[in-house]
Amino acid sequence: MRLEQLQAFLKVAELGSFQQAALQSEVTQSTISRQIQGLESALKCQLFHRGAQAKLTVAGELFLRRARKICQEWDVASEEISSLFQGKQTELCVAAIHSVCVSSLPSLLPKFCLGHPQIQLRVTALGSDRALKVLQDGLVDVAIIMSHRNLTNTKELAIKPLYEEQICILMASDHPLTTKKFITWENLGPYPQVIFKDGYRMRRLVEDEFSRREIPLNVSLELNIPEAFYGVVQGSEMIALMPQSLVTPVIDNPNFSVRYLFCPESGDRQDFRRQVSVVTTVDRLQIPPVAEFFNLVVDHYRCGALTVK
């Protein structure tokens, strides 16, 4: 059963004539006849009484309502898809890691909203694993996440690295470690740590680094809100390994100390950093507002939205 067969059926039913249906459809009468015959063959019944006027049979009357509904649904679907690729969608959903929501999106989002007043932006702060999952499940249009070695461009995903940033040690200003001129991985071992919950790639990055160095990771608390890290660290001997963008809000606060890890082998700062990328699906890049938002994010960071020290 094909759409043109249904359309031919509806036209004949409306006009009561194969000839008139052919004229209005700008095809030959034999074409209309073949389409109706094909439909009758598929349904295994006669749909019209052939005579001076084409009248619907009982089966034809029954089928008429269904055929109208099918064609109406097709028209609606065609219009919706056409509107989608013309950029007429009414909302755009973004999932982003907390640090991006705090540091960069507040200045970036108004630019998009100004150019697309008809689109409502919905932004959700999630861990990288969850953000990627909701993107792949079709619940959001764009995800801004922490990269990992298995995150590569595929036939389904379009990925653009945005920036890299150092991982810092956040601790209270009177923490015992602040007396050290240099802080190494081994120095961190004895102290309780606050880390991100499962589903956050920062947690995995920290766990992997401690494991690689065969240093026990003393986890005392799991959190997922940056502000909670500040409160816990400020009032205890707990420390937190956090990306630079998340320690920036408290870097000048006298209650905190922000330090970088030291590498004895090089005699310099330990190169412990993470990469952040923007991700969407390849098919979504064909939708104008999604492509524009994706490129806006890329350009935003290309212009130095984050200064990495």
UniProtKB/Swiss-Prot annotation:
SUPFAM superfamilies: Periplasmic binding protein-like II, Winged helix' DNA-binding domain. Gene3D superfamilies: 3.40.190.290, Winged helix-like DNA-binding domain superfamily/Winged helix DNA-binding domain (1.10.10.10). One of its GO terms (biological process) is regulation of DNA-templated transcription. This is Probable nitrogen assimilation transcriptional activator. GO terms for cellular component: cytosol. It comes from Synechocystis sp. (strain ATCC 27184 / PCC 6803 / Kazusa). Pfam families: HTH_1, LysR_substrate. The keyword Transit peptide does not apply. Coiled coil: none annotated. Keywords: Activator, DNA-binding, Transcription, Transcription regulation. Seems to regulate utilization of fixed nitrogen by controlling the expression of a certain gene(s) involved in nitrogen metabolism. Residues 18-38 bind DNA. PROSITE patterns: HTH_LYSR (PS50931). GO terms for molecular function: DNA-binding transcription factor activity; sequence-specific DNA binding. Residues 1-57 form the HTH lysR-type domain. Belongs to the LysR transcriptional regulatory family.
